[in-house]
């Protein structure tokens, strides 16, 4: 009778984490940014049928990178949780923090169970508040941990490089056009540092807009509206570049 092959618990967990990270890295990156009037979700997604971003409840949005069937199951579970809690108690009792805790328990249980493989997903749960100070953004990696994010967050294949780019350039009070332009610039940068162009038809964009009069703040941005915002953001960026150039020129003359 042969001796069973022994793997230490630490090595087993490390192998599962590496497996999940590699699966997530194969997915396209996405970013979530705060702007003056809410939170914007931006990702490269050539499919018109499969969405990376979805509404969970009135003020809560969901974003995910990784295996579609796995994060779609989580999304559906989140919608059911939110609907049941809002119906049983009150709509105000449905929060991003509560939903993030539910997702963390699910992901953590699956990750630590040897009976099934870990989920190859990374989630973002965001809730728009009455003011930017009350916005909430939570990132949930494959192991079920919760990271409280502020300003911007990136998940997916090139998340580390994109996060560094956003941290240097994102600022409070940006307009939607400015935030969208910054997000596209960040997503356009490849791992080798080169920049490529992402056409509007390959972008998936959604917002949680605190200024909407409706109770539901989630809205997708498509078609002509998306094109106009991209053009507006480009014009704003060009104007800032010209202003900086004139300032530098004036300083040289002095």
Curated annotation (Swiss-Prot):
Pathway assigned to this chain's UniProt record: Protein degradation; proteasomal Pup-dependent pathway
Keyword Membrane: no
Protein localization: Cytoplasm
Activity regulation text: The formation of the proteasomal ATPase ARC-20S proteasome complex, likely via the docking of the C-termini of ARC into the intersubunit pockets in the alpha-rings, may trigger opening of the gate for substrate entry. Interconversion between the open-gate and close-gate conformations leads to a dynamic regulation of the 20S proteasome proteolysis activity. Peptidolytic activity is completely inhibited by lactacystin, and to a lesser extent, by N-acetyl-Leu-Leu-norleucinal (Ac-LLnL) and benzoyloxycarbonyl-Leu-Leu-Leu-vinylsulfone (Z-LLL-VS) in vitro.
Main localisation: cytoplasm
Comment on activity versus temperature: Optimum temperature is 55 degrees Celsius.
GO MF annotation: an example: threonine-type endopeptidase activity
InterPro entries on file: Ntn_hydrolases_N, Proteasome_alpha, Proteasome_alpha-type, Proteasome_asu_bac, Proteasome_sua/b
PTM summary: The N-terminus is blocked.
Keywords: Cytoplasm, Proteasome
A Gene Ontology term for the protein's cellular component: cytoplasm
NCBIfam families: 20S_bact_alpha
Primary role: Component of the proteasome core, a large protease complex with broad specificity involved in protein degradation. The S.coelicolor proteasome is able to cleave oligopeptides after hydrophobic residues, but not after basic or acidic residues, thus displaying chymotrypsin-like activity but not trypsin-like activity.
Recorded family membership: Belongs to the peptidase T1A family.
PANTHER family noted in UniProt: PROTEASOME SUBUNIT ALPHA/BETA (PTHR11599)
Quaternary organization: The 20S proteasome core is composed of 14 alpha and 14 beta subunits that assemble into four stacked heptameric rings, resulting in a barrel-shaped structure. The two inner rings, each composed of seven catalytic beta subunits, are sandwiched by two outer rings, each composed of seven alpha subunits. The catalytic chamber with the active sites is on the inside of the barrel. Has probably a gated structure, the ends of the cylinder being occluded by the N-termini of the alpha-subunits. Is likely capped by the proteasome-associated ATPase, ARC.
Name by which UniProt lists this protein: Proteasome subunit alpha
Originating species: Streptomyces coelicolor (strain ATCC BAA-471 / A3(2) / M145)
């Amino acid at each position: 009778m042969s001796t069973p092959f022994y793997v230490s618990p630490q090595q087993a967990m490390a192998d599962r984490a590496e497996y999940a990270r590699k699966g997530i890295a194969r997915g396209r990156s996405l970013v979530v940014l705060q702007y003056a009037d809410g939170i914007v979700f931006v990702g490269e997604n050539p499919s018109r049928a499969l969405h990376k971003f979805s509404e969970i409840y009135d003020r809560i949005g969901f974003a995910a990178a990784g295996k579609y069937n796995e994060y779609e199951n989580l999304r559906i579970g989140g919608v059911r949780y939110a609907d049941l809690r809002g119906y049983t108690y009150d709509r105000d009792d449905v929060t991003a923090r509560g939903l993030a805790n539910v997702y963390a328990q699910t992901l953590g249980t699956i990750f630590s169970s040897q009976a099934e493989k870990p989920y190859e997903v990374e989630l973002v749960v965001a809730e728009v508040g009455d003011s930017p100070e009350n916005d909430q953004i939570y990132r949930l990696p494959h192991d079920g941990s919760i990271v409280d994010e502020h300003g911007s967050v990136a998940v997916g294949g090139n998340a580390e490089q994109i996060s560094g780019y956003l941290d240097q350039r994102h600022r409070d009070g940006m307009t939607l056009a400015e935030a969208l332009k910054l997000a596209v610039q960040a997503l356009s940068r490849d791992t080798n540092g080169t920049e490529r162009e992402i056409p509007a038809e390959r972008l998936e964009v959604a917002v949680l807009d605190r200024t909407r009069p409706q109770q539901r703040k989630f809205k997708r941005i498509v078609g002509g509206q998306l094109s106009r915002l991209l053009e507006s953001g480009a014009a704003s960026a060009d104007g800032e570049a010209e202003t900086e150039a004139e300032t530098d020129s004036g300083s040289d003359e002095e």
